[in-house]
Amino acid sequence: TNTLSLEDHVSVIEEISIKHPSLCISFTIGNGKTPLDANIQAYQARKNEKFLVKKFQIYGEVNNILENSSLNDKKVKILHIDINDSSGFGNHLSPYETTIKVMKSYVLLMDKFLEKNSLTFFLGGDNFMIIAADLLEKDEISALLNSISYELDIKFNCGIGLGRTSRDSAKNATEALDFIRKLRKKGQNIPIYEIK
């Protein structure tokens, strides 16, 4: 999803090494039909010390690098989610209790979306980003979010972004979420919006 070749990964590590010589980093490359598949492949390559470039500690499977992937032309789907009116929690919850509610949301998002081979990340505050399986449709996303909303008595806003790269998709997802927020300020409630 980052569309970087193996050579691109090497040049990134070289540049970081020049700017920050005391920093030691490594990359693990994996891809698959779903984000979870890619994560598992990357994990296995790292665990089994399958180096693509040992000098720079780049791990992966030769047949998984971008140039050989049949997955190159697929679009990446990313969701940018926030909790609607989480600042309003302060009217009846302490900051600690608010944090618990946000963390419970995170755990449930991870659990529900992992069942759909998608990976959830906490961005801070009340924001989450999900690298979604491309087969996950808007209606299914809505149903998953509604089930969590019901369980925790909260509401989510969800921007869905599609793009050729993860950067494009994340940008589109954030723009979609910003659009939802603008509409909310005008009194319109659209909890999910998608930009392709």
Sequence positions of predicted segments:
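Regulatory and interdomain segments flanking nucleotide-handling catalytic cores
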Residues: 1-196
